[in-house]
């Protein structure tokens, strides 16, 4: 099974530029075209949050149009720039998002299970997995202990050394680690948020962040370094 991960496309309404500089729609369209040229094609694509920049319905409509040429199913999860209800409405027809509550789900149609988490705190840059979300995860993993899992979430559950990003990280990574450690079938944790690639060990598995299709964050380890 081949899974391709995209992250943090930060799509805006048609014609708008991110920070008045970055044509995020053009960058995502280019990525989609490159994915469709891969041989063999991935079985699925996943996008690990910050799908759009302001959580507006027009942005999600634009995102759907940009993703429509993909030659494989695509599954999306929220990041801190997203808004649950507009996202839910935009992708409701695809049938995998829950009708209410947190945007957490499992995809059971492939040799590897996809398990998606919602780390969003509305109005905040950082993320959290509350007891309700972690209980859901524990149950989802316990329900199929023999099947390998790719876990997807926006905020990485580890410090990166980029202080300004770490201040907007996942608040309770220790609680997540306790759940993951109980379920050795978790093969990897796919994350976004950081706008660059970092991999590390976490709770007996490997967690990693994907670069953004929109723009990258400088690897500057000085405490007051700009993004």
Spans of features found by a protein language model:
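N-terminal active-site segment of His-dependent metallophosphoesterases
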Residues: 1-62, 143, 160
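Active-site glycine-centered loops adjacent to acidic/histidine catalytic or metal-binding residues
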Residues: 8, 49-50, 79, 117, ...
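A short acidic, helix-capping loop that chelates divalent metal ions and anchors anionic groups
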Residues: 12-18, 85, 123-126, 159-163, ...
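Short glycine-enriched, charge-decorated loop/helix-capping segments at active-site entrances
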Residues: 17-23, 123, 162-169, 223-225
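His/acidic metal-ligating clusters that form di-metal
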Residues: 31-44, 127-206
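Solvent-exposed loop/turn segments at secondary-structure junctions
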Residues: 51-53, 80-84, 121, 157, ...
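Extended active-site neighborhood of metal-dependent phosphoesterases/phosphodiesterases
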Residues: 57-142, 148, 172-185, 203, ...
